[in-house]
Amino acid sequence: MTRKIAVVFEGNYTNRYGGFNAVINRVVSLRAIADYAIDVYMIQVYDKGLTRLRRESTPASERPAAIEVEGVKIVMWWVERSWLDSLGHRMLGLSPTVMLGRLRALSARLRDYDIVSAHDRLAAHVALEAGRRYGMPVFFSWHGASIYTDPVEDRMIRRCTVELLKSPTCNFFVSEGLVREAHKLTPHFKYEILLNGAPPQFHRYSAAERHRLRSRLGVEDCKVVAYAGRFEPVKNVLWLPDIFHRIALKYDGRVVFWTMGSGWQSDHVKRGFDDSGIDYKMWGKVAPERMPELFNCVDVLVLPSRLEGFPLVTIEALACGANAVAADTVSTAEGIGRDNVFVLDDDFIDNISSRAAEMLARHIDQPLPEACSCAATAKKENEIYQRYLTKLPKNQ
């Protein structure tokens, strides 16, 4: 009898960024090597009425029942944010009791599964309640901000996260660095490391393909330096104009600078690019399906983020043959090497631009770590599940 796994995560179907893509990669890779029936559910929180007015949020233009991404059907679970929760949390630091009730009610939909795999905090609440009600093993995957940002900035979230870390059959973390951050919250939890990996579509094209692609995009006779990600403060994107300008000064050759992504700070960054006089192109929000071809044109990826868990974007860039430099945050060195990450101090912009210019000037080997493989991660995930499934009766 085929075992059934439910994968639950929180996301936004209109914004497919790192965590969203990491979940899909895990599902696709596990399906490829193991005979599981895997169903995927996404929690999308929405505002309406008083909550939308207070948060100045924009309502979703539509609320689909399901979407499909990379051949994976995702059933949508739409959960309304409560204005009582928002007020109680804002004024008194209270737990969101209405939201928690709505999440726990969703657990009834998971009663027939053998395993529930949840990604980050909201999904973990659903999975934990399902495990308590129906007795199946539950696994929580942690990707970044839900460990190193939210619990640090909010006492209520810290208490909640500590409870969740202690509760599942096992926690999965995307890096050793993220485990160290979690241990700052509590030393007591079970865990395994499941590194992010680049899916097969992210690979280095042939020399002929790359030449045709670069010619079509107008960068056949120059180097390309890029940033890929959201345009918001935690990403330090306002530093990009200065970083790119210094790279242009330090490299003796033509350089074009690209950005891929969107966010409320993009206009500020564009003005900085205009003032610096660099040659640039801002692609805006790029469909994930197109990222492999753009990365195959990139020579160096720059990631100055203030905080990152284990940035999937750097792994995808390396898989396509680009070099990568980044700020020395939670786990960036695990993916791109200690020599290519730099402390966020007064010398950061000078240091990261110098390393990027060096990479443009001469070949620097920067191999993708063997462990950063979707296949390797799927193999390990399957082995962990099998240890627990062998203890369960069929059709429990």
Q: What are the residue ranges of the model-derived segments?
A:
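Nucleotide-activated donor-binding/catalytic signature segment of Leloir-type glycosyltransferases, i.e.
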Residues: 269-286
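Conserved donor-binding/catalytic core segment of Leloir-type glycosyltransferases
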Residues: 6, 219-235, 241-244, 258
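Short His-centered aromatic/hydrophobic patch
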Residues: 118-123
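Short alpha-helical donor nucleotide-sugar binding micro-motif in glycosyltransferases
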Residues: 285, 293-298
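Aromatic "clamp/platform" in nucleotide-sugar-dependent glycosyltransferases that forms part
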Residues: 306
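Short hydrophobic beta-strand element within catalytic cores of glycosyltransferases
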Residues: 323-326, 333
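Carbohydrate-associated surface elements
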Residues: 177, 197
